[in-house]
């Protein structure tokens, strides 16, 4: 049985109902990734990314004396994923917990809401994290909100974040992003 948002088997077979968003190959769309670290709020965490042929490497160090997070985010997108149930990530982790972040047109007090869902990684092993849209929690600057629920028809951005209340180095390789 697959538990949503946790590593599952290493199969690369895809059914007809999956949608490849990127696999970081030269023919894959450039999602315009950029870094947002906790230094935007006085923190000391550091993180960066490097795209290679067939993967994106996100690495750095978190420091909980401040914001305690590092993230990468895509440029603004317009995705209708309403025919799908969630996001599937192919990752090689370090045993730490990561957060997948989606944004939509939803607003709270006039500001953009982001939606977070955590997933676990296996140290040094490739795994697949399947995260159903129903697991994404609305947040504003980390504060959990009562609503609105994520509307997969209006995805405007995505990102990867480490925010697990641990100090120290992190490294995650991301091979593909699918909607399933």
Task: Identify what each model region corresponds to.
Residues 2-180:
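Beta-rich carbohydrate-recognition modules and glycan-binding surfaces
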